[in-house]
């Protein structure tokens, strides 16, 4: 369980308009947990957004792939984020450089209060590939998918790419939020 509270506690970032509770790999992680150029990696995990889950209209990230090193390391390469809207939605965001675009999105309601299994496959490199599939665990039905066989998945000066999971959300519209407990399970990182 990843707990997040709307009232101030110790889950603030350097910027006080946002908060995070995440796990991630980092430079001291074993090499097989770090994405490197010309490598294909499969990330798998399960997660559940609880009944009544409330997203920020700004961002509520639940997963990111982020470069370490180089001038673009502050901008995530891929982001799964939920967003308050009409209707609320799940978005897959991508940034080749320092500008993010939405690659795909779906209504959030069918993803609430169900266990989901995610399979994300990425080939890191300037001639990269990316595929993500989110299925409902109870019946294996596909809730979200996206695939691209010609996408840039490496940044100049990057040392490696690290995955992140948890809750990272904006507090700019805190009135739209509540205390949350996001559930994750069965993390897997496999090099092919």
Residues covered by each model-derived region:
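Low-complexity, Ser/Thr/Pro/Gly-rich disordered linker/stalk regions
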Residues: 1-116, 122-192
């Amino acid at each position: 369980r990843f707990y997040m509270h709307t009232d101030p506690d110790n889950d603030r970032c350097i910027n006080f308009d946002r908060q995070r509770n995440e796990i991630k790999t980092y430079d001291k992680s074993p090499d097989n947990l770090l994405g490197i150029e010309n490598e294909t990696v499969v990330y798998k995990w399960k997660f559940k957004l609880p009944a009544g889950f409330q997203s920020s209209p700004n961002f509520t990230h639940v997963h990111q792939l982020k470069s370490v090193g180089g001038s673009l390391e502050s901008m995530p390469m891929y982001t799964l984020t939920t967003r308050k809207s009409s209707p609320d939605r799940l978005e897959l965001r991508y940034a080749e450089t320092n500008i993010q675009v939405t690659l795909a999105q779906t209504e959030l309601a069918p993803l609430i209060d169900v266990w989901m299994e995610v399979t994300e496959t990425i080939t890191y490199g300037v001639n990269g590939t990316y595929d993500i599939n989110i299925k409902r665990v109870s019946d294996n039905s596909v809730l979200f998918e996206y695939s691209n066989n010609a996408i840039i998945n490496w940044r100049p000066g990057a040392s490696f790419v690290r995955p992140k999971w948890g809750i990272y959300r904006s507090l700019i519209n805190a009135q739209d939020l509540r205390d949350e407990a996001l559930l994750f399970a069965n993390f897997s990182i496999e090099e092919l």
